[in-house]
Every structure is written in structure tokens, then in C-alpha cells.
């Protein structure tokens, strides 16, 4: 009897109750693949290129079919166009079951943002921490545009930091039905379209705004714009 009990105890103990989930990210501009120095157009008709595109993701949670919100342990990921490895985010510890949505923050939460420079993905070596202005850059887009009035026609949008009411983290929720099973790792493929930075509720004209690198109203509005840049990639 004791041996039988031990057998089933070991069997239950070895049964997985959680599994990993992989998020992959593809970058586009106006539904076209993002390519360095390729010319794109805003909805306002401005031509522009992108030379740098990166953003922080954190505070992941998943919503089950019964509307239970499963929050994962805090992790911070820096996704960058020039790093293929960064476009694959592996999240662990998600309980087995059926889910209908994923939620995450674009940026770094207030606790880490106000603690100062960190290590790992938050290491200042990645150029996403303002040493002269407390806080992290939540998202960065750089490039060029003939419409830019600065001498080299550059575009520099560094959105982040804290100053009074100006906080640029944005929460995203995407409907993405999937199943977490013990025998298989779920994969969710996401697309980030950089055109939304300039084509959202607040249209950006490069002749008027060719960059922004401090907390403020313009940064808030661009963050509102790019909070809509993510979608689930259709199969």
C-alpha cells in the first residue's frame, strides 16, 4: 500500500502544472517589413527612414477564458530591430489552461524607473537610460526625413522618463486565444508597426517635430500613438 501511494505521489509530483510561452515580434512600417534606410511615408505625406527602433516590454499577464488575470513574475525585455534574438521573448510559469488575451506594458514600471540604473536588459549600456534625467527611455525611434529642419535631417524620438504628470508607459491588451499544455510550448506571433508613432490620434509632421527627448506633452501623445502599434500576426 505504501509503495502504491509513493508511486502515485511521484507521478503527480512529476506532472507539469505550468509551461513556457514564447512571444515573437516582427517589425513593420505601414504593413511593410521594416528595413534599415528604406523610405516610408507617413499619413501626412512625409518621407522617412528608420535607422534605430527599440522598446522595453514588461509586466506581462495573461487573461484566461474565465477572465482570470494571471500575472507573471516581473521581467524586463528590450526588443530591438537590430537584434534577432531580442525579438523572441520567453515567459515561464504560466499555468496550464485556455487563454484569450495577453497584456503587457510598453516601458519600465515606476518602481524600476525611479530606482536608478539597473543591470540586465535595464543596463545603461543599451542606451535606454537618461543619465541627465531620472528614468528610462521606454521606446526609441531614430532615422531621417527630408522634412526634418535640423541640419542633418535626422529624426530622434526618445520617449520616456518622468516629470510631474508626464509618464510614458502604456499598457497593451491583445486578444490572442491559445492553449497552454504540458506537452507543448505555446507561441504567439506579434507585429509592431512603427508607422503608428506618427499616424495615430496625434499626427506628427516632421517639419514641426523632428524629435523629442524629454518627458512632456509631445512624448505623452506619441506614446498614446504607439500604444496601438501591436497586433497579433495572422497565420
Language model: regions and residue ranges:
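Bacterial Sec-dependent N-terminal signal peptides
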Residues: 1-23
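A short, solvent-exposed, low-complexity linear motif enriched for acidic/polar residues
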Residues: 19-235
Amino acid at each position: 500500500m505504501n509503495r502504491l501511494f509513493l508511486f502515485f505521489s511521484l507521478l503527480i509530483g512529476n506532472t507539469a502544472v505550468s509551461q513556457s510561452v514564447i512571444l515573437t515580434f516582427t517589425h513593420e512600417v505601414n504593413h511593410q517589413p521594416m528595413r534599415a534606410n528604406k523610405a516610408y511615408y507617413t499619413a501626412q505625406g512625409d518621407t522617412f527612414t528608420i535607422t534605430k527602433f527599440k522598446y522595453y516590454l514588461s509586466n506581462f499577464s495573461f487573461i484566461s477564458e474565465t477572465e482570470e488575470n494571471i500575472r507573471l513574475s516581473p521581467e524586463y525585455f528590450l526588443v530591438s530591430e537590430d537584434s534577432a534574438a531580442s525579438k523572441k521573448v520567453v515567459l515561464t510559469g504560466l499555468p496550464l489552461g485556455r487563454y484569450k488575451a495577453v497584456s503587457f506594458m510598453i516601458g519600465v514600471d515606476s518602481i524600476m524607473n525611479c530606482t536608478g540604473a539597473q543591470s540586465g536588459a535595464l543596463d545603461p549600456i543599451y542606451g535606454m537610460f537618461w543619465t541627465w534625467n531620472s528614468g528610462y527611455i521606454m521606446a526609441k525611434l531614430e532615422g531621417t526625413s527630408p522634412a526634418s529642419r535640423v541640419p542633418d535631417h535626422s529624426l530622434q524620438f526618445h520617449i520616456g522618463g518622468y516629470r510631474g504628470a508626464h509618464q510614458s508607459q502604456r499598457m497593451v491588451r491583445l486578444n490572442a486565444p491559445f492553449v497552454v499544455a504540458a506537452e507543448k510550448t505555446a507561441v504567439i506571433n506579434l507585429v509592431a508597426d512603427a508607422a503608428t508613432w506618427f499616424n495615430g490620434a496625434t499626427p506628427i509632421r516632421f517639419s514641426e517635430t523632428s524629435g523629442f527627448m524629454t518627458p512632456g506633452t509631445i512624448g505623452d501623445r506619441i506614446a498614446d500613438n504607439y500604444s496601438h502599434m501591436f497586433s497579433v500576426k495572422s497565420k
